[in-house]
């Protein structure tokens, strides 16, 4: 009997499968497509990651923990997945995104630099900005390699005795009180 079935081996599913297997649970991952496919949302070269969050303070502990988990994954997988390049949020100084990013950086002692449009265009020559835009550059930000992350999570999940069935579409599931039946 399985402890957990994880449906979908994309970014979230593969990470969940890995962490459950690492805790010693008997887990199965189900993916309706091949291991390599272009049907998910994790494909491409990069996904943004940042510590200064304009969405609100409640997310900061999650962001801090995610940085720790990415570094742990890199160490265990022995490849770089997280690239710390810094990140800039650009907007009008009165915009909620700009103000919230700046307030988050100040409140949580994050390393940041406020920049006007000329400073931004000098540092990042690819930008051509109107005069009313400014930026908050945060050192604690960058990008992830999402495809490598999924590969690392699935390979390490298997190393921790998880099972993964590819090309197995879930048709339905039914709660039987004592267990859940999954029909594929």
Regions found by a protein language model. Give the residues of each.
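Beta1/beta-strand and adjacent pyrophosphate-binding region of the FAD-binding site
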Residues: 1-12, 28
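Dinucleotide-binding Rossmann-like beta1-alpha1 core, especially the glycine-rich loop
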Residues: 46-123
């Amino acid at each position: 009997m399985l402890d957990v079935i994880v449906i979908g081996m994309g970014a979230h599913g593969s990470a969940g499968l890995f962490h459950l297997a690492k805790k010693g649970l008997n887990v199965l991952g189900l993916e309706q497509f091949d291991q390599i496919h272009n049907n998910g949302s994790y494909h491409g070269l990069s996904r943004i990651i940042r510590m200064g969050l304009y969405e609100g303070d409640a997310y900061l502990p999650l962001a801090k923990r995610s940085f720790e988990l990415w570094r742990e994954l890199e160490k265990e997988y022995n490849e770089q997945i997280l690239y710390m390049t810094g990140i800039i949020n650009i907007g009008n100084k009165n915009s909620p995104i700009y103000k919230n990013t700046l307030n988050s950086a100040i409140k949580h002692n994050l390393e940041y630099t406020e920049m006007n449009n000329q400073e931004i265009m000098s540092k990042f020559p690819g930008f051509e900005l109107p005069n009313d835009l400014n930026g908050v550059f945060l050192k604690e930000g960058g990008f992830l390699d999402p495809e490598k992350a999924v590969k690392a999570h699935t390979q390490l999940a298997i190393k921790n005795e998880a099972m993964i069935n590819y090309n197995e579409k879930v048709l339905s599931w039914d709660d039987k009180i004592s267990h859940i039946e999954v029909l594929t």
